[in-house]
Amino acid sequence: MAVFDGQYKKVLEEIYYGGYKYQDPNREGVERIEISMINLYCRPSVGFPALTTKEIYFKGAIAELIFFMSGSTDIRKLWEMGVRFWDKDWANFHKYSDAAMNNLYEGWKSKKKEYISKDTSSVYSMGRIYSHQWRNANGVDQLYNLVSSMIKTPMSTSLIVNSWNPADLPKMCLPPCHYSFQILCQPVGDTYKFNLVWSQRSTDFFLGTPVNIMFYAALAQVLEIMTGYKCDMVIGELKNVHIYDNQINVAKELMSRDPELHGESKLEIDKSKFKLFLENPSALNFNSVINLLSLQDFSLVGYNSYPKLKVEMLSYNKKQKS
C-alpha cells in the first residue's frame, strides 16, 4: 500500500461530500467545491509520495523544481524539459492569444531564424515568479542562504524561503500558490533531522497537489544530500482546498479506485552531481551544482499506478491580444 494514496483519497472525499460550492472569482463561469484548509504529510523514509490511484506527472514536478532552483524565469527552460503547463499563464501575462502563444512555441521548437537572431528573453519571460524570488529577491539568494544556514546554524528559526513579495505580484505571470516553505531542524545525537513545511494559499487538489507534494519531497531529498541531515516529514499546510467543476467526473473515478492496490515507490537522485558543493559549500559552487542538474538525475523507482485521468488545467481568465 502507498500510504499517501489513502490520505489523498480521504481528503478528496471530504471536499466532494462536505465542501461548499461557489463561483471561482478568477475563472469566469467556473464553479469550485472547497474546504477551508487541511494538512497533508509524508515520510520520505517510508516512500516517495507519488499517487498511484492515477498516473502522476513526475517529470513535471521535477522539471519545475529544477527550474525554480535555477532562478530562471524563461519559459523556454521548461520547454527544453518537455513541460508546458505554465504556457497559458505566461501567455495571459503577455496578453498573447492562443495562436500567438503557439506560434512562439513552434518558432522556438523549429529554431526559426527570426526567433533566435535577436534577444527575445523578455518575450519568453514569466515575470518575477517563484524562481526569481528564491534566487534573487531584491538581490537576496534565499535558497542558498537557506542551505548555508542549515549547515551552519541548523537550530535557527529563520530557515524560510518566501515567494510572496507584494511589490512583485503584478510583475508575475501567476501569484505564488505555494508561497513559502520552512525547515525545522532538531538534534539527533551528533547530527540533525528536519521537517519541511510548505504553506499554500490556494490549492487545486486534483491536478496541483499530487505535483506539489512530489516537488517538495524531491526538494527535501536535495536538501538531505546538501546538508547530510535526514528529512523526517514533508508537510503541506493547504488552504482554500478545492476541485473545479470540470474535475468532478475524474475525481469520482479516482475515489472508486483502490488506494491499497499498488506499493510504495522511491526517488533516487544522482549524488555525484553535488560533489563540488559538498567539498566546498560556497555560493559559487552552489550555483554550479544547481546548473548541472537535469531530469536524468532524478529517477522514480518501483512506481506502478492506475491509468492516467485526463482533465483540462484551467488558467486565469484575462483579456488577450493577438
Feature map (PLM): residue ranges:
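Terminal, non-catalytic protein-protein interaction segments that mediate quaternary/complex assembly
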Residues: 1-322
